[in-house]
């Protein structure tokens, strides 16, 4: 099983869509989490079908930016627990021996709001004692050379 997570900074760009499609074909992920989709639900459904995924959930963009989505294959018994503009939290194989948890996460881009992101992660962590895979863009900079553009 492979999981692919990408902050695409606008999936509506044809080059970005092509690059993500190439990654999907090359790695055959069972789950794909995408942050900053900048797309509405109808377009995400079209991409789900194009990339041959069986399921999808999204929190569509608000205003000009944002948006998170998860696509998954049917072999992943994907049960969404909670979602928001910044996360999608799900239990995989719910009630089975190999039950585990996946969270796709997009941290608050505004540094003054990072505390909200960390509070959300702490709340999510406390909900279950399952094995947990949390992937995404936390919008945290550890070293100055990591920062490109933005604020």
What are these regions (language model features)?
Residues 1-151:
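A shared catalytic/ligand-binding motif for oxyanion handling
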């Amino acid at each position: 099983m492979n999981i692919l997570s990408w902050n695409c900074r606008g999936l509506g760009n044809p080059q970005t869509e092509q690059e993500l499609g190439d990654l999907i074909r090359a790695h055959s992920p069972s789950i794909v989490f995408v942050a900053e989709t900048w797309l509405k639900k109808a377009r995400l459904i079209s991409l789900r079908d194009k990339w041959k995924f069986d399921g999808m959930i999204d929190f569509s963009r608000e205003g000009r930016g944002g948006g998170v989505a998860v696509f998954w294959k049917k072999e992943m018994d994907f049960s969404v627990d909670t979602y928001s503009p910044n996360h999608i939290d799900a239990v995989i194989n719910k009630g089975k021996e190999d039950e585990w948890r996946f969270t796709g996460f997009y941290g608050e881009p505004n540094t003054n709001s990072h505390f909200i992101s960390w509070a959300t992660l702490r709340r999510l962590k406390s909900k279950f004692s399952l094995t947990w895979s949390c992937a995404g863009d936390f919008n945290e900079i550890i070293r100055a050379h990591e920062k490109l553009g933005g604020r």
